[in-house]
Amino acid sequence: MQTPQFLQQRRKFAAAFLAFIFLLAVVDTAEAGKKEKPEKKVKKSDCGEWQWSVCVPTSGDCGLGTREGTRTGAECKQTMKTQRCKIPCNWKKQFGAECKYQFQAWGECDLNTALKTRTGSLKRALHNADCQKTVTISKPCGKVTKPKPQAESKKKKKEGKKQEKMLD
């Protein structure tokens, strides 16, 4: 029969042996992770930059629409694609729906042409749109009249009606 001291030594040896095996596995795994991986080949694309057409509204002359994109290149997987876009409805469409301008105040009325003008400088161009740097717009000169506030005119009408009823 084995003595308790022998059994204790055997357990210590087994524990040490298992710890040693565990350490070997950990070190081996760590070194395996450090192995040099073959570098991924960087694909140099022969594809050109995307060139986008103007945004074409789905209905009307503003709102949601689409634009076509194309690019050149012998080994391009995709040479055409369609992208959704939006034309803001408050932009001046006569200068291109993708060009946003900051306008100055209206100038004085030209008596010879009966027009007043103002200029706008380019504020923003969507999707590299080809926009003019400055634009000028004209509109007919109109009578300068200050509209009365509606609240006052309604109040006067009510008072007038009350006086008419009192007279009747």
Curated annotation (Swiss-Prot):
One of its GO terms (biological process) is memory. InterPro entries: Midkine_heparin-bd_GF, PTN/MK_C_dom, PTN/MK_C_dom_sf, PTN/MK_diS_sf, PTN/MK_N_dom, PTN/MK_N_dom_sf, PTN_MK_heparin-bd_GF_CS. Residues 92-99, 123-131 are annotated as: Chondroitin sulfate binding. Interacts with ALK and NEK6. Interacts with PTPRZ1 (via chondroitin sulfate groups); promotes formation of homooligomers; oligomerization impairs tyrosine phosphatase activity. Forms a complex with PTPRZ1 and CTNNB1; this complex inactivates PTPRZ1 protein tyrosine phosphatase activity through PTN interaction and stimulates tyrosine phosphorylation of CTNNB1. Interacts with ITGB3 and ITGA5. Forms a complex with PTPRZ1 and integrin alpha-V/beta-3 (ITGAV:ITGB3) that stimulates endothelial cell migration through ITGB3 'Tyr-773' phosphorylation. Belongs to the pleiotrophin family. Secreted growth factor that mediates its signal through cell-surface proteoglycan and non-proteoglycan receptors. Binds cell-surface proteoglycan receptor via their chondroitin sulfate (CS) groups. Thereby regulates many processes like cell proliferation, cell survival, cell growth, cell differentiation and cell migration in several tissues namely neuron and bone. Also plays a role in synaptic plasticity and learning-related behavior by inhibiting long-term synaptic potentiation. This is Pleiotrophin. It comes from Sus scrofa.
